[in-house]
């Protein structure tokens, strides 16, 4: 194992890269994607995506091929039942589609 890779969790790093690309893409559409943390209510999606014209959605970011934990899936299902758009993002190529679905328009990113 290379010395530079000692102690590095590549799953976490890959997830972080995807998350950073999502934030950048949302900004390019005039929106924001703050980290969503809810003390006392675990399992909520990672990012709240807020786009112009009052469009919003939630995004759970995972490393490629990873699935949400059972509690995360329960929260995703709850938010969807309440009528919110909720996406699971594990591939950066899906970012334009997600932004478009939330309300960023056909030509998203």
Give the residues covered by each predicted segment.
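Catalytic phosphate/metal-binding cores of nucleic-acid and nucleotide-processing enzymes, i.e., regions
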Residues: 1-109
């Amino acid at each position: 194992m290379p010395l530079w890779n000692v102690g590095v969790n590549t799953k976490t790093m890959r997830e972080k890269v995807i998350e950073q690309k999502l934030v950048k893409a949302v900004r390019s559409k005039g929106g924001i994607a703050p980290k969503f943390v809810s003390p006392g209510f675990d399992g909520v999606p990672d990012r709240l995506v807020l786009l112009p014209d009052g469009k919003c959605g939630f995004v759970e970011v995972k490393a490629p091929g990873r699935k949400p934990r059972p509690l995360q899936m329960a929260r995703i299902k709850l938010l969807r039942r309440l009528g919110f758009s909720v996406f699971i993002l594990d591939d950066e190529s899906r970012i334009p589609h997600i932004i478009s679905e939330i309300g960023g328009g056909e030509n998203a990113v």
